[in-house]
Amino acid sequence: MTIEFSNFTFKYWALEKPTLKNINLTIGKGEKVVIVGPSGSGKSTLGQCLNGLIPFAVKGDCSGSLKINGKDTKSLDLHQCTNIVGTVLQDTDGQFVGLSVGEDIAFALENQMVIQEDMHTIVKDTAKMVELDDILDVSPFDLSGGQKQRVSLAGVMVDDVDILLFDEPLASLDPKTGKAAIDIIDHLHRDTGKTVIIIEHRLEDVLHRPVDRIIMMEQGEIVANMTPDQLIASDLLEQHGIREPLYISALKAAGCQITEDDKPAYFSTLNLDKFKPQIENWYHQSFVACTPENSERLLTVNNLSYSYDGIKNTLDDVSFHINKGEFVSILGKNGSGKSTITRLIMGVLEPDTGSIFMNGQDLAQSSIFERSQKIGIVLQNPNHMISHHMIFDEIASGLRNRGINEATVERKVFDILELCGLKKYRHWPIDALSYGQKKRVTIATILVLEPELLILDEPTAGQDYHHYTLMMEFVRELNRKLGITILIISHDMHLVLEYTQRAIVIANSQLLADAPVNTIFSQPALLEKANLTVTSLYSLAHAMGIERIDNFIHCFIEHEAKNK
Ligand SMILES: Nc1ncnc2c1ncn2[C@@H]1O[C@H](COP(=O)(O)OP(=O)(O)OP(=O)(O)O)[C@@H](O)[C@H]1O
Ligand SMILES: Nc1ncnc2c1ncn2[C@@H]1O[C@H](COP(=O)(O)OP(=O)(O)OP(=O)(O)O)[C@@H](O)[C@H]1O
């Protein structure tokens, strides 16, 4: 199935200007391509033109043509498009049709009239590939964010379509499952010859397996269309605010010049010998010792246990503390209970046993409202938080609830809109925003309230590097200047390395480790237990024969922080 966009332009009815401008792009049958680009650049819109959601479900004006296998999509209907293109959507909640995980995976098979006996086997085998076989009877809506993402992946794997489109398949997946997902996509691609299109901000993770081409979008246009080696060796990623792989950042930090001939797109193909002297030199020159942590307690979690069903403990005797002014992360496998900890801190759930103290006060004595005055939480899925139609009102709502006068509300909201890169959208309805832009709105809504403890659940999911850097630098400023304590829950190891000092690792419902990030990331066996993976920074140091990998990681963290 060849895909051919010719002079293709698309404008949403709700917007004045076109979102896709004069796109000329051919994707050949059986190709595997990645689409990258800043948030709001039109990646999902391009994907939706392919799967027929545009123009059949979402209205707008198109000009030029989009042909799939020579057929203009204007002559097809939505049903015909979905029979050609299978999609894993960015917001998985909108995608579930079954009452259980098993039914959901089986849905596509029912449509294909697969016989019952085969159906059970196919569903089981597919669920096993994405580690869902234990929870086939659970409702998709009772799953953690990453588990939902796995259900969507499984659903599309059984689809009998020629083109597979993945819109941010990795956003909520833990690192190990993310790698497994990329392996699965790679197998599907090689075994079936299907055309595969992956839209993703986590470029290094996608490049875990080879791809044919990377297409870069910016403001509705295609600004690059080249091989991964060409792109990684160029300055284009940096210019367009897209994060380069960690090992490339480390090589550049050491002053190495990387060319296409070095085959830099994959760690496994990169010729490292050439760079060894520079890396060693940089490491020996830049090592500085860790700064000691502040020891005044803000939050103390004591022996916390919680079970949703009264049978299996989601959290089992978990204890940790967070000091005032710290920037800490919680890491762990999908479904290990990280978001559950957040719900217990907020008071949405009550612990079965154990307690949580804030500033020496037992939170069991405080209502949800009282807790929300001190603790701000940004949930994983922005669509679970938004309750107003207009962006300004959404961000202003918390301040207005506190009875703050309108002039102050306006000033604070404008300041935060600017900081979060949302100023030009202030009069927009939230519906007209991309997923990443919505996520930024929800972060702005909480940041404007300047909480004492800020908890960010997957802050970078769906965010491009440029926007997330702006936002995280602002969060870091809140942390450094105002002493606001920050807790992030994330599967984004690059983010965790860049910003947090200490990581709390949860595995199999229990606390597995609580240590500085450079210590955590230099222990492969520990990472493995929590479905985390070593980063390419570790692999680089290892390949260079550096003994104290924790020190090497620490050097890199210091370098990044200084050069932001
Ligand atoms: N349903 C819609 N109605 C009107 N405008 C929309 C709609 N969906 C997206 N847009 C607009 O189109 C632009 C591109 O959005 P799109 O979702 O394609 O971006 P994206 O590159 O996928 O971003 P992200 O990485 O944040 O998901 C955005 O500026 C957004 O405001
Ligand atoms: N409302 C609910 N009812 C029943 N079980 C639930 C509910 N919410 C979560 N669970 C289960 O509790 C476990 C922990 O979920 P939680 O959302 O805390 O995980 P998580 O570590 O945040 O995962 P992720 O990294 O995927 O976001 C999961 O196995 C999930 O299926």
UniProtKB/Swiss-Prot annotation:
Q: What class of enzyme is it?
A: translocase
CDD domains, A to Z: ABC_cobalt_CbiO_domain1
Domain ABC transporter: from-to ranges: 3-244, 299-533
Q: Which organism is it from?
A: Photobacterium profundum (strain SS9)
Query: What GO cellular component term, any one, is given?
Result: ATP-binding cassette (ABC) transporter complex
GO molecular function terms attached to this record: ATP binding; ATP hydrolysis activity; ATPase-coupled transmembrane transporter activity
Among SMART domains, the record links this protein to: AAA (SM00382)
InterPro entries for the chain: AAA+_ATPase, ABC_Co_transporter, ABC_transporter-like_ATP-bd, ABC_transporter-like_CS, ABC_transpr_CbiO/EcfA_su, ECF_ABC_transporter_ATP-bd, P-loop_NTPase
Record-listed E.C. numbers:
7.-.-.-
Species classification: Bacteria, Pseudomonadati, Pseudomonadota, Gammaproteobacteria, Vibrionales
Location of the protein in the cell: Cell inner membrane
SUPFAM superfamilies registered for this protein in UniProt: P-loop containing nucleoside triphosphate hydrolases
Q: Which residues bind ATP 2 per the record?
A: G332, K333, N334, G335, S336, G337, K338, S339
Q: What family does this belong to? A: Belongs to the ABC transporter superfamily.
What name has this protein been given in UniProt?
Putative ABC transporter ATP-binding protein PBPRA2240
Q: Among its keywords, does the record have Repeat?
A: yes
